[in-house]
From Swiss-Prot:
Binds 1 Zn(2+) ion per subunit. Binds 2 divalent metal cations per subunit: site 1 preferentially binds zinc, while site 2 has a preference for magnesium. Tightly binds zinc. Binds 1 Mg(2+) ions per subunit. Binds 2 divalent metal cations per subunit: site 1 preferentially binds zinc, while site 2 has a preference for magnesium. Binds magnesium less tightly than zinc. Composed of a C-terminal catalytic domain containing two putative divalent metal sites and an N-terminal regulatory domain which contains two homologous allosteric cGMP-binding regions, A and B. It is an enzyme of class 3 (hydrolase). Its cofactor is Zn(2+); Mg(2+). One of its GO terms (molecular function) is 3',5'-cyclic-GMP phosphodiesterase activity. This is cGMP-specific 3',5'-cyclic phosphodiesterase. 3',5'-cyclic GMP binds at residue 775. Pathway: Purine metabolism; 3',5'-cyclic GMP degradation; GMP from 3',5'-cyclic GMP: step 1/1. The gene is Pde5a. The lineage of its organism: Eukaryota, Metazoa, Chordata, Craniata, Vertebrata. Keywords: Allosteric enzyme, cGMP, cGMP-binding, Hydrolase, Magnesium, Metal-binding, Nucleotide-binding, Phosphoprotein, Repeat, Zinc. It comes from Rattus norvegicus (Rat).
Amino acid sequence: MLPFGDKTRDMVNAWFSERVHNIPVCKEGIRAHTESCSCSLPQSPHADNTTPGAPARKISASEFDRPLRPIVVKDSEGTVSFLSDSGKKEQMPLTSPRFDSDEGDQCSRLLELVKDISSHLDVTALCHKIFLHIHGLISADRYSLFLVCEDSSKDKFLVSRLFDVAEGSTLEEASNNCIRLEWNKGIVGHVAAFGEPLNIKDAYEDPRFNAEVDQITGYKTQSILCMPIKNHREEVVGVAQAINKKSGNGGTFTEKDEKDFAAYLAFCGIVLHNAQLYETSLLENKRNQVLLDLASLIFEEQQSLEVILKKIAATIISFMQVQKCTIFIVDEDCPDSFSRVFQMEWEEVGKSSEPLTREHDANKINYMYAQYVKNTMEPLNIPDVTKDNRFPWTNENMGHINTHCIRSLLCTPIKNGKKNKVIGVCQLVNKMEEKTGKIKAFNQNDEQFLEAFVIFCGLGIQNTQMYEAVERAMAKQMVTLEVLSYHASAAEEETRELQALAAAVVPSAQTLKITDFSFSDFELSDLETALCTIRMFTDLNLVQNFQMKHEVLCRWILSVKKNYRKNVAYHNWRHAFNTAQCMFAALKAGKIQNKLTDLETLALLIAALSHDLDHRGVNNSYIQRSEHPLAQLYCHSTMEHHHFDQCLMVLNSPGNQILSGLSIEEYKTTLKIIKQAILATDLALYIKRRGEFFELIRKNEFSFEDPLQKELFLAMLMTACDLSAITKPWPIQQRIAELVAAEFFDQGDRERKELNMEPADLMNREKKNKIPSMQVGFIDAICLQLYEALTHVSEDCLPLLDGCRKNRQKWQALADQQEKTLLNGESGQAKRD
């Protein structure tokens, strides 16, 4: 027959294997603490399922597919919080123990106890019941349960969870008395340290016995049966003690008592293990909820560093029960000092408080500790500053320390997001007992919590600093734009000259020939091009319809001209003017104005004149490859977006506001059309959208009444005007082609020199003999079908298509001639060879 203890163990194991799911045990084990516990959560099996550049997935959302409490809840006042009401516990009541001596009844009692263990996680209540069960077997006078704890220095000690449990005693009576025992001192400390049971007949004859407890309680201890409670790794997690055998064997505990005690203590081990796992998970959950609430509180404020520092200090003081919290912000320009210091005391929580500055500093020793932590980048926990001799300034400032009543101190660095730089220091002074207000040392749990909290503090502070930096940058930008707009505006003398000339006489559109699609600007001066532009605005009725002041219009035209770079061969003011002239001709001679609103006409002319503002002589591809700052501003159509921004800058500059006569809605509509029109000059967007337009024309389904189709037409019209040089008479087309080639070759030279890359044939100076064939390819791929579609919409735009076809014939002839010359050259070379 198996011994009672072995039978019990086998029976319990069998019962648990059938009814209880395995509980994963954390790697670092379970340690009971007087205030809280912490434990590393087991790693998810998905942790290694990562992809390059992606964060490691510690856990999958699918693992939470079960009925769980909501993550975000609302309290009674309706405030959103991560903290739930976890105090409500639904548990079955504990059954009362029965004290029968029969072994079969003992097994029944064990099963009854096992059921309680499986459905309850209250360590104190269950262990109290276990002791009452034990009392029925070994009949001792008193029982006590001590749990192993650790302080902030990881020094172990024992604290009573149940003390002096006696027959008839209540749970409240046994759990109210709390006694702390030193490790490896006294009988209990010895058993905890060595993990071996002790059966002592006369306590006062044992040198290990500590009579202080008897002196405190007034109780006389005689015999002691003291046994360790171990977890599954054979680590001592507690000690159970039975005192003074009440009957039989001379008042001493027998070997059978030892076996019975050990058997039932196995249940205590199970209870402690399960309950501590549960308690740890609850504490971890609550701590995470607290951190989430704190993070939410911090990130509510991102605009003012003063406000966020006040929130941080008030939250830490309230939660951690400290007398004073000081937050030091490191000076970026002078890393050895602090730029801002915010200090709050317990009495100031909830009140307005001003940050301390170094000029008003009254406690230099705080700076010394903060400077030390900043330099070492490690936390500092001093239980009693008056007894700490590690730092030379402690003794030098002892009077100062006593004056300000500095005792316990916890100082932690606040690091940036990359954890490689200290951006601040959080310093706590004098932790208080929650009930008495007595000053005590910070423990390991305080260190861990503050370490976690300053991570959120660091993010909050860094984000706020970034916001302040952005605000300063925006302020600087506004000043820069103000200066830029001043210098971007035309000179007053030039404006007055144009205004006077325009007031005297502006030739008619027929005289200036600006309604002709074959128009050439080569014989005009810059001032004459400005006069032509005034005539365009006048003949389109824009000056009259939108109450434009003559002086403002003159200044705006000259300012637009000024903001085109003179060192760019082709994409300069003359190209913008020619684009606007083609737009004017299409609107007037092409009779397209009749199909548009006044706002659309206004927007198209402004867009045509502004569509290449501040062009740098390079295309979008070069901007992207060279990693120009402009490439960081826009994800596509980089230069076109920049042209629109420059257009806005000129339009909003003082003295250039030609749209001031528009209502707010008209102004918004006009800017929207201008933006769409300027972006439409990006050939990449044209190629992307032209298929839809050509299909509408092919099916004869295009209608100006459809807003989307009309918007698409305006985009195509902008491209047609932008490329109109390809439709000019052959002499003009040749000269413009030379300008375009010069600009492209300059970009190719820069690509070869700056980017160390071989340019495309279009940009390659060494391939200039291919210009005719490339022009033919450009006309076929980009231009012909566009002008055919435009002519289908308005037959009066036929000159554009005719000019394009004629120039194609000219370029094809040159290409054929060059190919023939090349073949003849190769043939002659072959004959000579």
